[in-house]
């Protein structure tokens, strides 16, 4: 696993964070050292796949990066007769995802698409994963995507939405941000790395509160919604499409 040193030296002109070649190269290390509980979320996605993936359906991983969720789904699904569609708009991520998945034999068909997730039609879906992806879309585009997902899910289908959260109470928000930075330092990131990455992300990663996410999911059509995991200001929610 290549170690993330992207922000380890001072960068004179610090642009917005992008999922470019350098990020794709170190992404597994970056995400493990940056997102508390990431491994737990991936493990649970596999557990949810075991319960929700159905025969003959489609499973979508929107913002699939290097394919960690897809591997968990493939390993745990109760049937091999379904299809996985992984989507990412980063060409370097897509190339590495395809290469990574090809190292593990499976009879389950997987199609990795390089495209904007907003362009993807969701059909016959038993499961949709949005793992730390929605936060990179403009807020005005989020409800349309979630509504499309809701309509594309089969009855009893599940959406897994993992995000970094913000909090209305400033004291709580600052505490959880500080704990997250402590977590990153404990994982070997320097103050410079933490600071520069935060600056690079501030215009492209737009976080919402847990209640805002719940309200938006309700507006999209979901009625069964719950936060199932949280560590500091990161977490994951499930939303299930009820049977008629």
From Swiss-Prot:
Signal peptide: none annotated. It comes from the Bacteria. Keywords: S-adenosyl-L-methionine, Transferase. InterPro entries: CmoA, Methyltransf_25, SAM-dependent_MTases_sf. Coiled coil: none annotated. It holds the Pfam family Methyltransf_25. GO terms for biological process: tRNA wobble uridine modification. S-adenosyl-L-methionine binds at residues 38, 63-65, 88-89, 116-117, 131, 198. It catalyses: prephenate + S-adenosyl-L-methionine = carboxy-S-adenosyl-L-methionine + 3-phenylpyruvate + H2O. GO terms for molecular function: carboxyl- or carbamoyltransferase activity; S-adenosyl-L-methionine binding. Catalyzes the conversion of S-adenosyl-L-methionine (SAM) to carboxy-S-adenosyl-L-methionine (Cx-SAM). Belongs to the class I-like SAM-binding methyltransferase superfamily. Cx-SAM synthase family. Homodimer. This is Carboxy-S-adenosyl-L-methionine synthase. It comes from Haemophilus ducreyi (strain 35000HP / ATCC 700724).
């Amino acid at each position: 696993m290549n170690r993330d040193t992207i922000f380890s030296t001072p960068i004179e002109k610090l642009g917005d964070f992008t999922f470019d070649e350098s990020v794709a190269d170190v992404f597994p290390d970056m995400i493990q050292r940056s997102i508390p509980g990431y491994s737990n979320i991936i493990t649970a996605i596999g557990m949810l796949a075991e319960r929700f993936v159905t025969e003959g359906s489609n499973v979508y991983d929107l913002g699939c990066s290097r394919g960690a969720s897809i591997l968990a789904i493939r390993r745990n699904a109760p049937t091999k007769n379904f299809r996985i569609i992984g989507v990412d708009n980063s060409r370097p991520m897509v190339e590495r995802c395809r290469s990574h998945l090809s190292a593990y034999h499976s009879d389950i068909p997987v199609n990795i698409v390089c495209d904007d997730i907003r362009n993807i039609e969701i059909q016959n879906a038993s499961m949709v994963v949005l793992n730390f992806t929605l936060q990179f879309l403009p807020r005005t585009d989020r409800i349309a995507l979630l509504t499309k997902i809701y309509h594309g899910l089969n009855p009893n289908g599940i959406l897994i939405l993992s995000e970094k959260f913000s909090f209305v109470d400033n004291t709580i928000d600052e505490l959880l941000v500080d704990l997250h930075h402590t977590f990153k330092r404990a994982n070997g990131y320097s103050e410079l790395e933490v600071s520069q990455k935060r600056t690079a992300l501030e215009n492209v990663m737009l976080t919402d509160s847990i209640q805002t996410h719940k309200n938006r999911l309700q507006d999209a059509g979901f009625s069964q919604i719950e936060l199932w995991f949280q560590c500091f200001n990161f977490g994951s929610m499930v939303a299930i499409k009820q049977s008629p």
